[in-house]
Amino acid sequence: MRKILDRYATYSGSDPRVAPAVLASIAFVEEAFGAWHIKGGVGKLADAVYQRSLDRGVKFEFNTSVTQINHDGKTTTGISLADGRVLDYSIVVANADTTAVYNKLITGKVKKLRRERAKLAKADPSLAGFSLLLGLRPSENPTGLSHHNIFFPDDYDAEFGDIFDRKQPVQDPTIYLCAPQDESMVKHSGHEAWFVLVNAPRHDLKDGFNWNDADFNHHYAMQIIDSLESRGISIRDRLEVLEIRTPADLERTVAAPGGAIYGTSSNGARSAFMRAKNRSPLQGLYCVGGSAHPGGGLPLVGLSAEIVAQAIVGKASH
């Protein structure tokens, strides 16, 4: 029971040994209201948001890197792009990690940001994730798996000692396996698409673990598959596609520092106050995402977006 309740702290990338006990209340939410699956996978949510945005007249520029958020010391004035363009805007919404926003996209001494930068410097980043995407041929025998499956090790506390204290891959990790019975997620009938995730230390060459070693990553993936097969779950004889995603991959693809996909952790009673405000001290700049209020995880990130949208609409109406 303690393992199950401790598990909910990891939903926000936190260490259950020091995270607020209120996170265990997520168990009630799941039991009372259920956990929901989007038909076709969570990517369909992004498709729906994209289409809704197009319908509302939003213009998208993909594969366009923002190199700087421009300002006059008090107010946001726009953004600079990697291709040399400078775009003038009175409102900028930044969904990048707030540490990167305030220290890389906004450089130099900015009096209005002094307190926010100091606060973020004290915040603990979340843990990262090492994941496997598995494409499986049809099984001759029923797997007996649920949509969500969690396999705990004997020593659960050791996992967080490895991640947060020793900053090394977990020797015997808790394994989350998502095995959706959703034909729209696979190309051929009877095939399955599984998502396997274990918690991991951040990618950091100085103060973390180096996830750039392809040989180690493959070995670790095989270790996870071995652990699942030792529990009677057939994988290798059905395996058609294997894609490995490390914290280093997450850092490269989504610009999450160290692959800390939840932004800031909830480690400690005051952790919630260490997150960036949605409304930046720099007028016209808004922060959204896992490292901003109210925290990490898709549901909270959605609330973060709602808060920012309402703040902007409220400002425009006055």
Regions found by a protein language model. Name each.
Residues 1-56, 63, 253-266:
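Active-site/ligand-binding neighborhood in enzyme catalytic cores
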Residues 137-247, 251:
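C-terminal segments that line or cap access tunnels to active or ligand-binding sites in enzymes
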Residues 65-71, 313-318:
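Active-site-proximal substrate-binding core of FAD-dependent oxidoreductases
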Residues 290-313:
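A conserved FAD-binding loop/helix module that cradles the flavin
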Residues 3-12, 29, 170-178, 230, ...:
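A glycine-rich dinucleotide-binding beta-alpha-beta segment and adjacent secondary-structure elements
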Residues 37, 67-188:
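Mid-domain catalytic core of redox enzymes
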Residues 17-24, 189-198, 281-283:
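Short coil-to-beta-strand
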Residues 93, 134, 196, 228, ...:
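Hydrophobic, well-ordered secondary-structure elements that form the walls
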